[in-house]
Amino acid sequence: YATLALKGFFEWDELTKLRHVGAMLQGHPDMKGTPGIDMSTGSLGQGISAACGMALAAKLDNKSYRTYTVLGDGEVEEGQVWEAAMFAAHNKLDNLVVIVDQNGLQIDGTVEEVAGIEPLDKKFESFGFEVIKIDGHDFNQIESALEKAKTVKGKPTAILAKTIKGKGVSFMENQVGWHGTAPNKEQYEQATAELQAEIDRLEGNC
């Protein structure tokens, strides 16, 4: 939502109304009510299926655009994800990039405890994907992976991005309880202070 606001899809003030009753911006984005949203979310696993349709449409229409979809590693437990993966490889959708946020946690606990998905790289490879493994917090690695994906021909690409849930906020890092919890005022102030301190460090202001 923040990125869409910065790009001018709606006013920045809309961000202060997140998840308010009747507000434009809800927990699950709505393509019918929110500018800039290509696909509504809700049921896990649907994103990659929609992305496959968009990528196939580009091929059929001889368009050069590329399609990107982001999956959580808990979401990868859904069978629909693997049906879509099989479809993508079968149709040689080399204009499709699947990015998996691998933080090892989901709403019900750890991914491994709920339904283990490893070795995820081997699974995607066996389904016919080019696989790139990266540190999901390293922007240089992210950029390099996206550029490499553009060179892959004849098959889709899966970028497996290893991350830490709640990265940058000490009391949120790797804590499953923060999956859908809103911070109170004190927690919000501490979190923003920690994040600002990291920004200052990276920019050399401290």
Report each predicted region and the residues it spans.
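Histidine/lysine/aspartate-rich catalytic loop segments that bind and position anionic ligands
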Residues: 94-114, 118-124
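A short alpha/beta connector and helix-capping loop motif
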Residues: 78-103, 158-160
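Cofactor-binding active-site loop characterized by glycine-rich and histidine/acidic residues
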Residues: 1-83, 89-90
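Conserved thiamine diphosphate
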Residues: 62-65, 112-145, 196-206
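Generic beta-sheet signal
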Residues: 65-69, 96, 155-161
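Glycine/aspartate-rich loop-and-adjacent alpha/beta segment that forms the canonical ThDP
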Residues: 139-206
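Short acidic, glycine/serine/threonine-rich loops at helix termini
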Residues: 1, 30, 80-82, 108-112, ...
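Acidic, glycine-rich active-site loops and adjacent beta-strand->loop/helix elements
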Residues: 21-24, 71-78, 102-106, 137-139, ...
